[in-house]
Amino acid sequence: MVTMKDLLECGVHFGHQTRRWNPKMKRFIFGVRKNIHIIDLQKTLRYFRYTYNIIKQAASEGKVIMFVGTKRQASETLKQYAESVNAPYVNYRWLGGMLTNFSTIKKSIRRLEIIEEMESSGQIDLLTKKEKLMLQRKKEKLDKYLGGVRHMKKAPDMIFVIDAAKEKIAVAEARRLGIPVVAPLDTNCDPDMVDYPIPGNDDAIRSIQLFCKEISEAILEGRSENKDEQNEQGEQIAPVTNEEKQEILDEVTAEVATQMQEEA
């Protein structure tokens, strides 16, 4: 579990410039140094350990925790730790409705599965060069946006967010559905929007790595206490039908025809 030494070494105590603060964060601020708010690490440590146990308990009950963090310095780290514990994640861009309209997201995930099946069966090689290229581009785009949630069968039970201010749409969707939100809170954040806050720097790479590492370890520790856990993410993909393939082929053919008309 996290220590005071970890927090100091990773710069978790450095907040934003004083002019960028949210007054609601006042209770978590220790002082000011060179116009930078310094976060009270005694409180950070207490909140961190409390939240660690909340995550651990949720994981021990078989609950699914989604990782969300799309900004540049968080994207790869978040993906790495989420994949290490087989957790769903969004690290490129949050699509509106990812939680509140999950049925539509599942349809897009299904399209990705269909295209991949067409690739593995060799059917994609029977298409024209333009059709094949267009289909591959569709696959790349779907994978970029939805690759991290493709095995998620329902909305998550909890979300862990890096930069709650930036990911305000994800946070708002979770709150609308009653899904608890866990997040480090920098001095520019609104603590009222987060169920389980951890006051701390959400911009520095080392700080982000520490948060992701600890949350991942809490998940693993919780799962180890649940020997009977049935992980929904291991479910088999439904067989792709010819009708599903044909629907995508018709769409690609129409798009290629439109493109050729525009080029003519």
Swiss-Prot record:
PANTHER family recorded: 30S RIBOSOMAL PROTEIN S2 PROKARYOTIC AND ORGANELLAR (PTHR12534), SMALL RIBOSOMAL SUBUNIT PROTEIN US2M (PTHR12534:SF0)
NCBIfam families: rpsB_bact (TIGR01011)
PROSITE patterns from the UniProt entry: RIBOSOMAL_S2_1 (PS00962), RIBOSOMAL_S2_2 (PS00963)
Annotated stretches, region: Disordered: 222-246
Molecular function terms from GO: structural constituent of ribosome
Organismal lineage: Bacteria, Pseudomonadati, Campylobacterota, Epsilonproteobacteria, Campylobacterales
Name of the featured protein: Small ribosomal subunit protein uS2
Signal peptide: none
